[in-house]
Amino acid sequence: MSRVCELTGVSVQSGHNVSHSQRKTKRKFLPNLQNVSLFSDSLKKAFKFKVVARAMRTLDKVGGLDCYLLSASDKTLSKSAIEVKKIIKNNESKS
């Protein structure tokens, strides 16, 4: 089970814990992943994604799942998100 956001591509980062005496020990910075069902306005259907909390704020700012997916590049999206994006594009072209 990977720790990667399906919409933004944010993943685990590595770094150091630094003590007062400046000793450095390795650590991991884990993303704040949440399992969320996001509603598509054009498809009238909900989709489940594993998303970072910051991405949920971005979705609210942009105007929802449909607007975000259509404006996002395919490099950052997961395979399931790309499939949803294609379905939304096809649905908009039909109507």
UniProtKB/Swiss-Prot annotation:
Keyword Ribosomal protein in the entry? The reply is yes
Among the GO biological process terms of this entry, one is: translation
* Pfam families according to UniProt: Ribosomal_L28
> What Gene Ontology cellular component terms go with this record?
cytosolic large ribosomal subunit
Superkingdom is Bacteria
Query: Which GO-annotated molecular functions does the record name?
Result: structural constituent of ribosome
Keywords noted in UniProt: Ribonucleoprotein, Ribosomal protein
Q: Report the family membership.
A: Belongs to the bacterial ribosomal protein bL28 family.
Q: Which HAMAP family match?
A: Ribosomal_bL28
Descriptive protein name: Large ribosomal subunit protein bL28
According to its UniProt entry, this protein's organism is Orientia tsutsugamushi (strain Ikeda)
